[in-house]
């Protein structure tokens, strides 16, 4: 890898510089943290396990595909008003922990046998759900936005990540929702789930997640944590906590 880096440098494809120089360039070009995305649709063994990260200064989300099954593995909102533990004093341990405000946390809320996530489901006549297999995604970058489209048999599924919001649409004749499930026994931050907002508290910090389009429904039987129901076939989640 070092040989290849040197070769690319000599060819003008790679610039070698110090972190100070990189930081100065970044600050000059981006006064505010820009939106970024990272896509990896095959794992190291070329298995059809894919992951897409989208990050802005307001939130981050991770979308996972395991074969043809999709889930939001991670949706965390950022609040610049919350000071990190290391803002005014140095860290003295061997690890640093930076807290963000979760709507979905596939790492902390999962177990070896149950993967937490927000999944696309069809609502059955008895109120139960069936996960819809979305198939593999088509990915398009459009300015600061990321647009993801899937074509399951049940309709057209679209996710649009913008800097301040998540937009999800499913053009289908099925009754559908996004359904959050977690492993049993996990401590969740949600204090109150109402139609248009979730009141939550994490690490001593209260926050609210609002649905600009669609509504939240809490489970009444423990089969899931909550559902986000669409309005006119779409859901919009406001990811700006500073409003």
Predicted region positions:
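Beta-strand-rich recognition/accessory modules
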Residues: 201-243
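Short aromatic-acidic-glycine turn motif
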Residues: 84, 184-201
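Surface beta-strand/loop "capping" patches
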Residues: 28-65
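Short, structured interface segments
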Residues: 13-37
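Acidic-aromatic substrate-binding/catalytic surfaces of carbohydrate-active enzymes
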Residues: 63-145, 153-154
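Short, exposed beta-strand/loop patches in secreted or surface proteins that constitute
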Residues: 43-45, 52, 130-143, 157-161, ...
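Acidic, contiguous internal or C-terminal segments within carbohydrate-active enzymes
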Residues: 144-191
């Amino acid at each position: 890898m070092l040989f290849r880096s040197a070769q690319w440098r000599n060819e003008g494809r790679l610039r070698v510089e110090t972190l100070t120089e990189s930081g100065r360039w970044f600050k000059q070009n981006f006064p505010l943290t820009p939106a970024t995305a990272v896509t990896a649709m095959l794992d190291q063994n070329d298995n059809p396990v894919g992951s897409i990260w989208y990050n802005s200064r307001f939130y981050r989300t991770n979308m996972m595909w395991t074969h043809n099954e999709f889930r939001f593995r991670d949706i965390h909102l950022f609040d610049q008003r919350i000071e990190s533990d290391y803002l005014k004093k140095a860290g003295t341990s061997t690890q640093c922990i930076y807290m963000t405000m979760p709507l979905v946390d596939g790492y902390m809320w999962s177990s070896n046998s149950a993967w937490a996530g927000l999944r696309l489901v069809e609502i059955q006549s008895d109120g139960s759900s069936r996960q819809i297999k979305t198939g593999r995604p088509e990915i398009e970058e459009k300015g600061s936005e990321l647009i993801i489209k899937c074509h399951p048999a049940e309709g057209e599924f679209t996710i649009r990540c913008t800097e301040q919001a998540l937009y999800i649409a499913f053009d289908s004749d099925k009754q559908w929702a996004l359904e959050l499930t977690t492993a049993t026994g996990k401590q969740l931050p949600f204090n109150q789930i109402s139609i248009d907002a979730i009141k939550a508290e994490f690490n001593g910090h209260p926050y609210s997640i609002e649905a600009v389009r669609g509504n939240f429904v809490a489970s009444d039987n423990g089969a899931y944590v909550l559902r986000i129901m669409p309005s006119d076939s779409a859901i919009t989640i406001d990811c700006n906590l500073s409003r």
